[in-house]
Amino acid sequence: MPSFDVVSELDKHEVTNAVDNAIKELDRRYDLKGKGTFEFKELTVTLTAEADFQLEAMIEILKLALVKRKIDAKCLEIKDAYASGKLMKQEVTLREGIDKELAKKIVAHIKEAKLKVQAAIQGEQVRVTGKKRDDLQEAIAALRAYDSGMPLQFNNFRD
């Protein structure tokens, strides 16, 4: 039976490149020159600046750099800014993987669409199986139209 997996993955190398591009853009911006920094560790970016409006501008720079590298900005989890001495800090976490709650919503959406496919949760991915390839393509189209709050990719397509 044909099947495919629904996953949410990030290319860590592209994320690193996007953060590096954001750092370069920060150095080029006249209004932010020398006033803010990006620190990248694993999948967390810490933004440091003197004021809230600078943090907002830095988040926009980061989002733009990620989109240029073909990474969906939906994967960002932006936490509240907090004061650290004279500076303001804010953490941005890049989310990866499908948690159980989102997996249940994806399975429910596929069932609501009344397609001739079955969906099963397997860890951090959802396996969709059907009798025909056309049914799977309809399921992919339905999931692309569905706003899950996370970027979804489809891989491991088997006939």
Swiss-Prot record:
GO terms for cellular component: cytosol. InterPro entries: DUF520 (IPR007551), UPF0234-like_C (IPR035571), UPF0234_N (IPR035570), YajQ-like_sf (IPR036183). The keyword Nucleotide-binding applies. One of its GO terms (molecular function) is nucleotide binding. Keywords: Nucleotide-binding. CDD domains: YajQ_like (cd11740). Pfam families: DUF520 (PF04461). It comes from the Bacteria. Nucleotide-binding protein. Belongs to the YajQ family. This is Nucleotide-binding protein PSPPH_4093. The lineage of its organism: Bacteria, Pseudomonadati, Pseudomonadota, Gammaproteobacteria, Pseudomonadales.
